[in-house]
């Protein structure tokens, strides 16, 4: 015996729920959110596939707005739609139209940056073809052409263009400054400093009241430098081993290149064990002093 036919209302309910999900607009913002927007556009394309492509009437196409990565043709090759931005999901197969196609200067690549050994599946993401920095006509350095084009489309009235390849010339800028700190005699102290500049900056350390560049001839003070962590940056450290009361004072990180100089001070407070016991940690914290361990943890934070 055949089961009784389902009422028409029951058959239509799943379709209505799907349409409600599909047609719900994504949250607004300068850069579209990858998840909801992809689901909406992808399911809309799947629904359209069942109907096939209607005759193309460009005059009936809605003009897309806010396309920071430019425009591409839709699945039927008729109307324009916003292209996908860098970092958004995309269709590896050019003939597919679920996630969408990447914009100008972008290409769809498998992102293998995840931990494949733990079962993470590579995703197809839009990636910029070039990773070379550029100087914009606004005097700002852009990490690559795709970022500059996004900024240009976000601010069309600015007439932003490429001034020249490579970063804009810039005086030094302190990216991560040394922090005020304290410690007990006999312990080690480290100050850190990161400087951005183009041309590259040099870093030196000085102490208020001394005319020499550290470390001088002091065997318990050492300095170290390395490039990075980002391009056109340099990082410097000042280490004082087994601090003494005479080490107390203000130390300065100085960054300079041909276009200028910048500096950032940090104070060191040195306590004897007796002073520490009589003063107490709460009183020290009221002076806005940061212990060495906390200062190091803040310096290791990603500042981008």
Curated annotation (Swiss-Prot):
InterPro entries: Growth_fac_rcpt_cys_sf, Ig-like_dom, Ig-like_dom_sf, Ig-like_fold, Ig_I-set, Ig_sub, Ig_sub2, IGFBP-like
Glycosylation sites: 159, 183, 277
GO cellular component terms listed in the entry, alphabetical order: extracellular space; interstitial matrix
Ig-like C2-type domain span: 172-269
Domain called IGFBP N-terminal: residue spans: 49-129
Main location group: secreted
Kazal-like domain sequence ranges: 120-170
Highest taxon, organism lineage: Eukaryota
Localization in the cell: Secreted, Extracellular space, Extracellular matrix
A Pfam family annotated for this UniProt entry: I-set
Disulphide bond pairs: 53-76, 56-78, 61-79, 67-82, 90-108, 102-126, 135-168, 193-253
Keyword annotations of the record: Developmental protein, Differentiation, Disulfide bond, Extracellular matrix, Glycoprotein, Immunoglobulin domain, Osteogenesis, Secreted, Signal
Range of residues in the leader sequence: 1-30
GO biological process, one term: regulation of signal transduction
GO molecular function, one term: insulin-like growth factor binding
Primary role: Involved in the proliferation of osteoblasts during bone formation and bone regeneration. Promotes matrix assembly.
Name recorded for this polypeptide: Kazal-type serine protease inhibitor domain-containing protein 1
